């Protein structure tokens, strides 16, 4: 909990809900009480709405991961909270939490870690990010993307992630466009020559069409296109 406060994942204004029971029945009761508290507060029409942070210890989380009834309470509770902290958990439990959320929701999950104990979690998520640092390169080598420091995550997602999505989309659409353009002209020419098999282009022209004639626009768009500046993307995260 102290680390959550120090990294500002949990703020002083949040109400912290702690689940640290050892028995499955006690864990179920604690989760249900916390969920009732969060839902009751959300139902009250007052502003500003109180924010919650959920803290779950490893032995309680173990019951959640192996009991679907507990998972049915845990996930709605986690969705009502601004932050969820799982403490004193094993590397396997980290991966199982990701698998649980992945199985029960349609959201895209991102996992980030900096050590060997985060490898399973990183590989279980849709997108894995490894931080190369003092704890070695195991996480960075097993991840989809590697960064040097945690603070680079903001620019990686809001700027480079946004640009990459737009570049890939435009490149794919352009590839379809240039291919359709070529073969539609051949189709219309076939109507003109009564489908005799005569081609409208020389064989070398058709070979060079994708390799030379239409290659540069795809490369330029796929590498250099910036439909919005980096400063604007960081200033307005809603664009992400």
Language-model features: locations:
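N-terminal phosphate-binding loop and flanking beta/alpha elements of the actin-like ATPase fold
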Residues: 1
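Membrane-embedded transport module
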Residues: 5-110, 115, 119, 123-240
């Amino acid at each position: 909990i102290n680390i959550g406060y120090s990294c500002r994942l949990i703020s002083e204004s949040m109400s912290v809900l702690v689940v640290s029971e050892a028995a499955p029945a006690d864990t179920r009761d604690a989760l249900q009480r916390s969920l009732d508290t969060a839902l009751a507060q959300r139902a009250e029409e007052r502003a500003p709405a109180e924010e919650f942070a959920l803290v779950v210890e490893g032995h309680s989380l173990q019951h959640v991961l192996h009991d679907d009834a507990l998972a049915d309470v845990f996930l709605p509770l986690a969705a009502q909270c601004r932050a969820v902290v799982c403490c004193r958990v094993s590397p396997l439990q980290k991966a199982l939490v990701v698998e649980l959320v992945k199985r029960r929701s349609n959201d895209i999950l991102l996992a980030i870690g900096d050590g060997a104990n985060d490898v399973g979690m990183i590989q279980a998520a849709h997108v894995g990010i490894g931080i190369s640092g003092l704890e070695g390169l195991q996480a960075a080598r097993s991840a989809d993307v590697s960064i040097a420091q945690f603070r680079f995550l903001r620019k990686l997602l809001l700027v480079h992630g946004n640009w990459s999505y737009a570049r890939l989309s435009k490149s794919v659409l352009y590839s379809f466009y240039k291919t359709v353009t070529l073969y539609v002209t051949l189709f219309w020419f076939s109507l003109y020559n009564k489908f005799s098999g005569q081609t409208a282009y020389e064989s070398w022209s058709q070979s060079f069409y994708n390799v030379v004639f239409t290659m540069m626009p795809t490369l330029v768009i796929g590498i250099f296109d910036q439909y919005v500046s980096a400063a604007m993307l960081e200033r307005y995260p809603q664009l992400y």
